[in-house]
Amino acid sequence: MTERVPPRRPATFKLSDPSVVLIDSDDGGGSYTAKPSAKADARPAASAAGAAPPPPPPRARVELAREAEPPISAPKAPKSVINPKKGFRWGTVFWSAATGLVSLAFWLWISKLVEDLFAQSQTLGTIGMVLALLAGGSLAIIIGREAFGLIRLARIEQLHARAARVLETDNSAEARAIIRELLKFEHPNPQLAHGRATLQKHIDDIIDGADLIRLAERELMAQLDLEAKVLISKAAQRVSLVTAISPKALIDVLFVAIAATRLIGQLARLYGGRPGALGMFKLMRQTVSHLAITGGIALSDSVMQSVLGHGLASRLSAKLGEGVVNGMLTARLGLAAMDLTRPLPFDALPRPQLGDLVKDLMKKREKDE
């Protein structure tokens, strides 16, 4: 019977070992040994008189397989799973036609009134015509201001979305276009003169697009963010105080609504927006939608710790508790409005947290007590 050869046991070795043979598959199977290490060079060379010892058998053979790199191709845009077809909007047609009919009816009524006044007296007709012209001119100015406010709000939304894309794509040309438009947008604000000068000096430098957006955020938004935080904190404190001392629930609801509307308008004007009545309605709707998306007034651990850490959980009355909750709701509304009215997204600067505002609210409450 032939003797069974035991299997080779696994062993470890280094590729720098001179006894390891490396085989390159691209060279047609040609083999070469690794270069000896420093320790191998330190070995004494064989004497010239003696015969050279036979080379030891290789400990291992390693084949180097080189895989071909796949060609790099630009990624294709994913096809939209849902491709809604824009149909004819009958609702828009209805409201446009209804508005036109109401406008014509109002115009006919005004013209009929002026004709009747002229029939009664020349003086009354003249006064009626002047009043009608004043009313029409005032209405045109109001409509123009509303349209101007909506346009500025739309520009803020576009700047915010474009800056967010630049932070992802690092497009320098788009970043410079955004900065130039932002400088024109914030030009009326004298508080940002130093930041505008700094950006004008660095706008043509060799800077990545994302870094340029971050520079603009630090130079233009830092001071505005501090003022916005003060506005939100003061509004939350006022709501908390009035809710705690008001005798009627209806007064609480009205004051919270008025304070929230006023706060949103102040934040919009702080960041460069000039919303009118329609603009405020749009901002209120967007703020409520933003709150619904982000989870409403969800309290984090830091917020709960700030509330419980002041010992209020055991000694808060019902009205005082309502005041604190309404104050936190106002602060949450302010933070949501801050996200919507800010021309640049938060990236280089820290986003204000609800916990910090709640801590300020608790400190104010302790002073009042």
From Swiss-Prot:
Membrane topology: Multi-pass membrane protein
Name of the protein: UPF0283 membrane protein RPA1583
TM annotation in the entry: 90-110, 124-144, 239-259
Compartment(s): Cell inner membrane
One Pfam family linked to the record: DUF697
Listed Low complexity bias regions: 34-51
Domain of life: Bacteria
InterPro entries noted in UniProt: DUF697, UPF0283
Keywords carried by this UniProt record: Cell inner membrane, Cell membrane, Membrane, Transmembrane, Transmembrane helix
Region (Disordered) location: 1-61
Family: Belongs to the UPF0283 family.
GO (cellular component) term, any one: plasma membrane
UniProt organism field: Rhodopseudomonas palustris (strain ATCC BAA-98 / CGA009)
